[in-house]
């Protein structure tokens, strides 16, 4: 998981009332590997804005997609809109 997405997960938990440190520890429980957001990911994520903005995707969403592209890994999401993307990625819906 990208450090950007880990931060997003922590933020969502804090918004629901978790103390920040507890939210961080809870978010970590779902991570097998944490990958720092770097310039390669930033370049890909930034270049996706025209395609992803009409679907309402966030920087965190684009960071996730960029990391998957670089790793040639599938992306798991609950957001059905991602299936409309025309990137060379395997997008798997969780529900």
Roles of regions detected by a PLM:
Residues 60:
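Glycine-rich, Arg-bearing micro-motifs that act as flexible, cationic patches
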Residues 78-82:
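Short, polar loop motifs at secondary-structure junctions
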């Amino acid at each position: 998981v990208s450090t950007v997405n880990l931060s997003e997960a922590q933020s969502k938990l804090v918004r629901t009332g978790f103390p920040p440190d507890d939210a961080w520890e809870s978010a970590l429980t779902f991570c097998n590997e944490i990958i720092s957001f770097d310039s390669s990911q930033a370049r890909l994520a930034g270049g996706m804005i025209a395609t992803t903005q009409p679907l309402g995707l966030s920087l965190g969403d684009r960071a996730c997609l960029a990391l998957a592209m670089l790793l040639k890994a599938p992306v798991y999401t609950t957001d059905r809109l991602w299936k409309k993307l025309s990137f060379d990625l395997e997008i798997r819906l969780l529900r």
